UniProtKB/Swiss-Prot annotation:
Pfam family, one: Rop-like
Keyword Signal part of the UniProt annotation: no
Gene3D superfamilies: Helix hairpin bin
Protein name per UniProt: UPF0437 protein asl1434
Length: 71
């Protein structure tokens, strides 16, 4: 049971950090989009990085839900 608690806490900490990073990436992507066509060459890289952060966040949230339901 202690192992599960630690895992849940670790995942919650990772989610918190990723949420902060994801919010910043979302704002960066928004700012880049507002400035189009300037810096359009960066659009795919920023979008891909933003997608990856949100994919990781979704994966962690699903893992957390499984651990919490297993209790």
């Amino acid at each position: 049971m202690q192992v599960e608690e630690t895992s849940i806490e670790e995942i919650q900490t990772k989610i918190k950090r990723l949420n902060s990073k994801a919010g910043q990436m979302k704002m960066d992507l928004h700012d880049l989009a507002e400035g189009l066509p300037t810096d359009y060459t960066q659009l795919m890289d920023v979008a891909a990085a933003t997608y990856e952060i949100y994919r990781q966040l979704d994966e962690l949230k699903q893992e957390l839900k499984k651990l919490e339901n297993a209790k």
